[in-house]
Design a protein with these regions (language model features):
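Short glycine/serine/threonine/alanine-rich loop segments
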Residues: 127, 153-154, 179, 208
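Rossmann-fold NAD(P)-binding glycine/threonine-rich loop
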Residues: 135-151, 159-180
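Rossmann-fold dehydrogenase core element
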Residues: 173-186, 207, 211
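Active-site-lining helix/loop region of Rossmann-like oxidoreductase modules
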Residues: 9, 48-51, 62, 69, ...
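Short catalytic-loop micro-motif centered on adjacent basic/acidic residues
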Residues: 130-132, 156-159, 182-185, 212-213
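N-terminal glycine-/serine-/threonine-rich beta1-alpha1-beta2 phosphate-ribose binding loop
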Residues: 1-145, 233-238, 275, 284
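NAD(P)-dependent Rossmann-like dehydrogenase/reductase catalytic/cofactor-binding core
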Residues: 302-360
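Gly/Ser/Thr-rich loops at beta-strand to alpha-helix junctions
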Residues: 10-16, 134-140, 160-166, 187-193, ...
Length: 360
């Protein structure tokens, strides 16, 4: 079936992990279980079929560099898992709009280069899938790139908490244009959101009433520094919260009983994230039952392990001529999909989609 030609907007830590990951797993045996991957072979596409053909950023230290160099430039501080050879892809100047918040502007220098013609570039490079890795709070910028994807007839993977796939207006736009979208807000392989979801569902399934819960996250990357600007966090908090509360059947915990969100920036953590989660409930005889745990992860590789499948799902949909939200992939890969499902059901739907048994 050929390659999956990918463009990236936002060459930060998540992009760095994704680009490294494709190189790291390029020779993985498609018939074996490989640590770190849900699918070595995803339908017709092996990891090695993913090819990066365009990249956009606004950081002066990244624009003009080869993608292989840009992923280690400026404030990027994720773990290095392999060397990446020269890609032949030069990072182009993207469009800023609301993509740079206060802390980004205090930290980086915005490129003085003229912004690229995004739609024309996507067409010229024959891009299959555009991955949106913009900073949290980039509402206008994310929607701008979503429209570019529609105009260029390029599938869109929305990794950030701006509600596009999950809103009727945008879902209709993608459907009418015949362009696939997978979104919104990437759900990491084994991160705070999916473990919290599983624990909340476990309480429900075992007859324990969940009364209140919290999830506190700290990290040392630019994502966490950006999120110190609380005005940019509204959609992020909504996304992380509904991902967990959607697992509680027929009951609203109430806003005062749920606190989920980023909490602070700790520079020495680099791209590591520490999540502290607590669930308080009542078991047999209304006896209190509390669960508390701490999760430590490298944030960006944890995300890349899911995006590597999301881009291939988007390409399969494009190959099949399916436009609009790809519900199976969105449900399993994203925190805020158009339709929330239990993760086991979402996985089953995804496998059915890969096999061609369901349209989307």
């Amino acid at each position: 079936m050929g390659s999956v030609r990918v463009a990236i907007v936002g060459v930060g830590n998540c992009a760095a992990s994704l680009v490294q990951g494709v190189e790291y797993y390029k020779d993985a045996d498609p018939d074996s279980k490989v640590p770190g991957l849900m699918h070595v072979q995803f339908g017709d596409y092996h990891v090695s079929d993913v090819e990066f053909v365009a990249a956009f950023d606004v950081d002066a230290k990244k624009v003009g560099l080869d993608l292989a160099d840009a992923i280690g430039a400026s404030e990027n501080n994720t773990i290095k898992i392999c060397d990446v050879p020269n890609s032949g892809v030069t990072v182009q100047r993207g469009h800023t709009l609301d993509g740079l918040g206060r802390y980004y502007r205090e930290t980086i220098e915005e490129s003085a280069e003229e912004p690229a013609d995004i739609v024309q570039t996507l067409k010229d490079r024959q891009v299959d899938v555009l991955v949106c890795y913009l900073p949290v709070g980039s509402e206008d910028a994310a929607k701008y790139y979503a429209q570019c994807a529609i105009d260029a007839k390029v599938a869109f993977v929305n990794a950030l908490p701006v509600f596009i796939a999950g809103t009727k207006e945008w879902a209709d736009k993608f459907t009418e244009a015949g362009v696939p979208i997978v979104g919104d807000d990437i759900k990491s392989q084994v991160g705070a959101t999916i473990t919290h979801r599983v624990m909340a569902k476990l309480f429900e399934d075992r007859g324990v009433v969940l009364d209140r819960t919290m999830q506190l996250n700290v990290g040392g990357n630019m994502d966490f520094k950006n999120m110190l600007e609380r005005d940019r966090l509204e959609s992020k908090k909504i996304s992380k919260t509904q991902a967990v509360t959607s697992q509680i059947r027929d009951r609203d915990l109430g806003a005062d009983n749920v606190h989920i969100g980023p909490s602070d920036y700790v520079a020495w953590l680099d791209d590591r994230k520490w999540a502290y989660v607590r669930l308080e409930g009542r078991a047999f005889g209304d006896v209190p039952l509390n669960l508390e745990y701490k999760l430590e992860v490298w944030d960006s590789p944890n995300s890349a392990g899911v995006i590597i499948d999301a881009v291939r799902a988007a390409k399969i949909a494009k190959d099949r001529g399916v436009g609009g939200p790809i519900l199976s992939a969105s449900t399993y890969f994203m925190k805020s999909p158009p339709v929330q499902m239990e993760d086991t059901k979402g996985r089953a739907q995804l496998e059915a989609f890969i096999a061609g048994e369901v349209e989307r």
